[in-house]
Amino acid sequence: MKRVAVLLKTVMCEFLKCDYNGYDRIISLLRRILTLICTPNLNGLTIKRVIDSMQSLEYIKQTCNFKLQMCISSMAFKRNNALQNCNHYAWCDDHCSDIGRPMTTVRGQCSKCTKPHLMRWLLLHYDNPYPSNSEFYDLSAATGLTRTQLRNWFSNRRR
C-alpha cells in the first residue's frame, strides 16, 4: 500500500509540472486518491470508497491516453502536410534529370519506430528536454542512432 501511495505522489508531481488545460480535475482526483490511501485507518475504508478510487484511476488513465493520442495524431497531421510538398520535389528531380545535371543526394530519414520513441521520451521529460549522458546512451541503444544524430534531433525538436 505504501508503494501505491509513493507512485500516486510521483504521478501527481508529474502532472503538476505539465501545463495542459483540463488537468485540474485529474490533479484533484489524484489528491483525493492519495488522501484515501494514506489514511491511518485503512481497515475503515468501505468498498464504495475503494471502487470510487479505482474509477478515478481509470478516468486518469483514459484522459492520459486521450492526450497522448491527440499529440500523436497532430504529429501525423504535420507529417502528412509535409508529404504533400513531395510532388514539387518530384518535379524538380524530373526537371534536373532532363537538363542533364546530377540529382542531389537525399539524406536518410529516421525509422518509423525511432521518432515515436524519441517523442515519448521528450513528452515524459517536458520540464527538462536535455538528456543526460546516460540517457543519450540508453536512447542510442534503443533507437540505433548515434549521439550526434540524437543531439541534432533534440535540438531541432526544441525549436
Curated annotation (Swiss-Prot):
Keyword annotations from UniProtKB, A to Z: DNA-binding, Homeobox, Nucleus, Stress response
DNA-binding region: 103-159
Name of the protein in question: Mating-type P-specific polypeptide Pi
Single biological process term from Gene Ontology: mating type determination
PANTHER family: HOMEOBOX PROTEIN TRANSCRIPTION FACTORS (PTHR11850)
Note: There are three genetic loci for mating type genes in S.pombe, mat1, mat2-P and mat3-M. Cell type is determined by the alternate allele present in mat1, either P (plus) in a h+ or M (minus) in a h- cell. Mat2-P and mat3-M serve as donor of information that is transposed to mat1 during a switch of mating type.
Family label: Belongs to the TALE/M-ATYP homeobox family.
Single Gene Ontology MF annotation: DNA binding
Domain of life: Eukaryota
Role, per record: Mating type proteins are sequence specific DNA-binding proteins that act as master switches in yeast differentiation by controlling gene expression in a cell type-specific fashion. Required for meiosis, but plays no role in conjugation.
Keyword DNA-binding: yes
